[in-house]
């Protein structure tokens, strides 16, 4: 891992299925002073991950889950370790309360709940009631809620309705990095705010500036691959702006920063820098919208919940979100 000079806090999310490898990874990150915070992700619902026994499948084995989280905490020193998970694999296999209690007992600094099951993937609505139940069950460390935070007011409602200590933002910030500034404003943590109204959504001209900056930073960090990775972000940024399908199609074919600059300049000139966002687009999901889909598990995975045997080594090679 590497971070920009002065970037703080240096936070990294780890995915692992085997306690010893997680222990070694955390020990290395801490010993080399590479991080200020480590998050463990047990939320990935994708079949390629769960069928190998990774991601959202791990909390079904509470002793294995305990061993992995404990291995991370035991090697983290003063660096806080947080844990993210889903409600469970499906409504018949809910694991979030036990997972929260285990993480609390072995020394996690906080837990985060994506309030959907793995079967839901990213469909339907997040079950904020589950966040409230987790908050009631886990009493000595912070509990964060995740799911359906599209606007700053969603975060306030989630905290008010559940009593949780904070929120985790996922898809809501894709194409809308200013959501974090809006959250700081409504929480009263912005230098210009005492807990006030956020700014109006940016017009097209400001979005184009943000897109160009984002792309340059991504290329600086990832090299030539960065511009290809940025292609998918262009649709997320422009969702809700009446720019037309041709512009979106062209932007998703860019090969270099010069392509992006030329297309953005032409788009702003044609549509006007003051083109506003359709307010109804704020709540349109970006990125994943698939689901529900039956969760695929390794054969016999549910036979013995107390079995702490890690899944095969190939499960460690799979990486995704949650």
What role is predicted for each listed range?
Residues 6-8, 77-78, 139, 223:
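Residue-level preference for short coil/turn positions at secondary-structure junctions
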Residues 1-14:
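Short, structured active-site "lid" loops
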Residues 18-20, 152:
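The beta1-alpha1 cofactor-binding region of Rossmann-like NAD(H)/NADP(H)-dependent oxidoreductases
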Residues 13-16, 125, 149:
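Conserved residues at beta->alpha junctions
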Residues 95-110, 129, 133-145, 149-322:
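Alpha/beta catalytic cores of nucleotide-metabolism and tRNA/nucleoside-modifying enzymes
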Residues 20-54, 58, 62-142:
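Alpha/beta enzyme core
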């Amino acid at each position: 891992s590497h971070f920009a000079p002065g970037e703080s806090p240096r936070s990294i999310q780890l995915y692992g299925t085997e306690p010893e490898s997680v222990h070694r990874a955390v020990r290395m990150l801490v010993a080399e002073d590479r991080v200020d915070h480590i998050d463990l992700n047990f939320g990935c619902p994708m079949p390629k991950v769960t069928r190998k026994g990774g991601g959202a499948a791990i909390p079904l084995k509470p002793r294995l889950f305990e061993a992995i989280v404990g291995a991370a905490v035991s090697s983290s020193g003063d660096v806080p370790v947080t844990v993210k998970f889903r409600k469970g694999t499906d409504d018949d296999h809910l694991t979030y309360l036990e997972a929260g209690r285990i993480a609390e007992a072995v020394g996690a600094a906080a837990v985060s709940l994506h309030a959907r099951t793995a079967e839901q993937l990213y469909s339907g609505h997040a079950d904020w009631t589950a966040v409230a139940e987790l908050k009631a069950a886990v009493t000595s460390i912070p509990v964060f809620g995740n799911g359906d935070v599209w606007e700053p007011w969603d975060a306030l409602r989630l905290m008010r309705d559940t009593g949780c200590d904070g929120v985790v933002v996922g898809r809501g910030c894709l194409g809308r990095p200013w959501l974090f500034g809006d959250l700081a404003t409504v929480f009263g943590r912005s230098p210009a705010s005492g807990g006030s109204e956020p700014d109006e959504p940016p017009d097209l001209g400001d979005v184009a500036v943000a897109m160009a900056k984002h792309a340059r930073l991504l290329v600086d960090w990832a090299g030539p691959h960065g511009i290809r990775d940025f292609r998918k972000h262009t649709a997320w940024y422009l969702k809700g702006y009446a720019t037309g399908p041709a512009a979106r199609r062209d932007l998703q074919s860019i090969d270099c920063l010069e392509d992006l600059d030329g297309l953005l300049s032409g788009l702003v000139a044609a549509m006007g820098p003051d083109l506003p966002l359709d307010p109804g687009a704020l709540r349109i999901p970006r990125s994943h919208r698939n689901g529900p889909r039956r969760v695929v598990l390794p054969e016999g995975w549910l036979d013995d919940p107390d079995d702490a045997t890690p899944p095969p080594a190939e499960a460690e090679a799979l990486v995704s979100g949650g």
